[in-house]
Amino acid sequence: MALPLLEYKPTTQNQRVQSFGTADVNEDTPYIYRLENANSPSEIEELIWAAYRQVFNEQEILKFNRQIGLETQLKNRSITVKDFIRGLAKSERFYQLVVTPNNNYRLVEMSLKRLLGRSPYNEEEKIAWSIQIASKGWGGFVDALIDSTEYEQAFGDNTVPYQRKRLTTDRPFSFTPRYGADYRDRAGIVRPGRMSNWNNSANQNYDGVAILGVLLAISAGMTFLFVLNWLGISSSF
């Protein structure tokens, strides 16, 4: 049984404040792709790739991640941009690349950025949506976001989601890594603490080898002198 979405208090973010047209002339404001403005095959291709950049991220736009069936339906206008975004987010490739390596809290953060164009309001919202993932599954969570009133008011049926009212000092959402620090730890990537410990042990090993080399050199020198001394005594007889 799916649990209802817990209540949370939205905080003030840029996309909730009227811009008075200032954001429209800001060079960092993203170009808004709308299906009704795509009147040529090249313009539809640009819209499709904008959707891939938004959902899959800049670093994950690879040929084998393409969803040709969804692209064809969109080009034929048999589905809306909203349906195309939904299909990309629920595709097997997206699940393997993004969903599998992450926990529910990071999935909520990434999904709000990629599908709703904003960051989470607070930890309460992240907890509320993470419960939806646990109770409805990934597909149900995606449907809940895309069918939400916020998505409808922000993008409607035929607008590609975008980062709403980004400041020049903000990192673009399209460059957000697909996995967090916990995945890097599980993947076995060496952390700084472990690297320093390894360096310390390595330095200790190098010191031991150096000392052993010096002792061997001294021993060899003493042996050589002993042999020379013995040969000198033997020749005197």
Curated annotation (Swiss-Prot):
What keywords are annotated for this sequence in UniProt?
Antenna complex, Membrane, Photosynthesis, Phycobilisome, Thylakoid, Transmembrane, Transmembrane helix
Pfam families per UniProt: PBS_linker_poly (PF00427)
Spans through the membrane: 208-228
Gene3D superfamilies for the chain: Phycobilisome linker domain (1.10.3130.20)
Q: Does the keyword Magnesium apply?
A: no
The protein's matches in InterPro entries, at most eight in alphabetical order, are given as: PBS_linker_dom, PBS_linker_sf, Phycobilisome
Q: Name one GO cellular component term.
A: plasma membrane-derived thylakoid membrane
Q: How is this protein positioned relative to the membrane?
A: Single-pass membrane protein
Query: Which protein is depicted?
Result: Photosystem I-associated linker protein CpcL
The coding gene here is cpcL
